[in-house]
């Protein structure tokens, strides 16, 4: 059963079946079974079935350079023109891939872990009440928890004039101590702005929520790969700029120590129809040291999970833990060696020549991609690009 048939089967299935299945590396699997594999089990299965060829599509177009401080394009001092850089050509010259923040991908759900704010608010208020040694129960509703915490805060302000010693219990972890300090600083800041206690507390919880969600999304950076160089949807979209870009073939080397870290951090995407609510499970990890259980939850419910609508990509991802606010250069990572470059069907003569020159320089085989005349498929062109009258004269083929 090919990938398109799998997608149609899952999309047309009754809700009970569709909600329990997923597509992983072109195979239909039970979603619960995949989840129960855990990090180690899923990783081992992925490595057993990993394709030895991976493909990355590049748009091959210039990008304006933006000043991070002003947010404005950087101008050339002499010409006054906006400075640009072609990251696709840079990646081809350097044999690197760019580790992107998933929040910038084209899928609005990408790496978005399902945290419900209302449930988070209640759980967080309960946690802060416990740290203040307030007599509360898990069965209490959000307004009750908020009122109990506000009463304790108000009593401390009235008796001592500050809230520096609001938290009574001994903190267990450094992260918990930091979260307590953040709470106090944010609450003081809100009160100094003239907010009433209720609004101040609400804003603190909102800040907590946004900060934690950002942490979950930014724990890793990713770069994406396909398993075929002939996908019309990949060529025709922004990935290859409507056939004007190129596609690079990489050969995976599982046993080469030089690429061991890359190999171990490559995973197939999990395509399904359902998004679970992870609030209760993830809130308990918020101020704890990261564990393999948390890592798997971020992977399974976040960076490796996408809608079934994207299953045609049959995507593999390289995931690496990387801090935010590093330079662009730091996010460029050396990858497996090139073994072929596929040139887009609509590449201009100038763009094609530039890529071919780099291929000659690095001794990389290259081939043009053309339309199959009999079926709607892309295929290798049998004519060498330099000898092809269509491309030397910019005639569509």
Language-model regions, residue ranges each:
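Partner-binding and oligomerization surfaces adjacent to conserved cores of proteins
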Residues: 2-397
